[in-house]
Amino acid sequence: MNKERIIQEFVPGKQVTLAHLIAHPGEELAKKIGVPDAGAIDIMTLTPGETAMIAGDLAMKAADVHIGFLDRFSGALVIYGTVGAVEEALLQTVSGLGRLLNFTLCELTKS
């Protein structure tokens, strides 16, 4: 039986590879992610990974949000708060990375 393997590689560069807002997550999902009282959750992945620290700073300064998870090695960032606050933080963080650090940006998505 042949199994398909997927290998994810990071290439040198500065980019936001994922920026997704989950509005009104289900209770089970929010609990599994580790943010049980979240009205909204934002998931971002960035390269290089250390950018997650800068993105977390930008997000917290942009709106009343909290950091649920930040990994400077993989570039993963999860923020949470109210829908309006998380959406504003996501918009400001992504645009700030593009404007200040000349990052390549991805499309912002929402569910």
From Swiss-Prot:
Pathway per the UniProt entry: Amine and polyamine degradation; ethanolamine degradation
Q: Matching PROSITE patterns, A to Z?
A: BMC_CP
**Could you tell me where this protein is found in the cell?**
Bacterial microcompartment
Quote the CDD domains the UniProt record gives.
Answer: BMC_PduU-EutS
User: Principal place where this protein is found?
Assistant: other
InterPro entries membership: BMC_CP, BMC_dom, CcmK-like_sf, EutS/PduU/CutR
What positions does the domain BMC circularly permuted occupy? Answer: 5-103
One Gene Ontology term from the biological process aspect of the record = ethanolamine catabolic process
Which UniProt key words apply to this protein? Bacterial microcompartment
Q: Name one GO cellular component term.
A: bacterial microcompartment
Gene3D superfamilies, alphabetized: 3.30.70.1710
| Signal peptide interval | none
According to its UniProt entry, the function of this protein is described as: A component of the bacterial microcompartment (BMC) shell dedicated to ethanolamine degradation. Its unusual hexameric shape may help form the BMC shell. Targets at least 2 proteins (EutC and EutE) to the interior of the BMC. Proteins such as EutS containing circularly permuted BMC domains may play a key role in conferring heterogeneity and flexibility in this BMC.
Name the family the entry cites: Belongs to the EutS/PduU family.
Notes concerning its domains: One side of the hexamer is concave and lined by hydrophobic residues, the other side has a slightly protruding, 6-stranded beta-barrel.
Q: Entry's PANTHER family?
A: BACTERIAL MICROCOMPARTMENT SHELL PROTEIN EUTS, ETHANOLAMINE UTILIZATION PROTEIN EUTS
* Subunit and interaction comment: Homohexamer with a central pore; the hexamer is not symmetric, it is bent by about 40 degrees; bending depends on Gly-39. Interacts with the N-terminus of EutC and of EutE, targeting them to the interior of the BMC.
Name the UniProt record assigns to this protein: Bacterial microcompartment shell protein EutS
Biological source species:
Salmonella typhi
Q: Which gene encodes it?
A: eutS
